[in-house]
Amino acid sequence: IQVISGLARGVDAAAHAGALAAGGKTYGVMGCGVDFCYPTSSRKLYHVMQQQGGILSEFAPGTPPLSYHFPLRNRIISGLSGAILVVEAKEKSGSLITADAALEQGRTVFALPGRAGDLLSEGCNRLIYQGAIPAWKPEIIL
């Protein structure tokens, strides 16, 4: 399994790090030029990924990370992926933008079910309600 994500803090960074720790490949799709590491807290991971996977961007080198770039890059994340797994998402989340793009592209969408009322589970629970496959154990995805 290869991980394709946006190198963001939290679940994205953990997924990239986990793939690398397991000897896998991982790819970061940036919302800026490939010469920018954003967020800067992922600098070490960014450099390792350059050697054990890749850093990709539709933005030219020298393009800074701007807020409106991140929703745009999410369609590339889904386009490069065979399937999307949303682990946690608030009701307004970039992960939901990626899931919507995946559905438009005919990709399978998985979501980790969460507790009702948990703000970080609202997006996943909504995706499941709308037809995403509940991923409560790894075998469902694999």
What are these regions (language model features)?
Residues 1-142:
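Glycine-biased, small-residue-rich flexible motifs in mid-sequence functional cores and linkers
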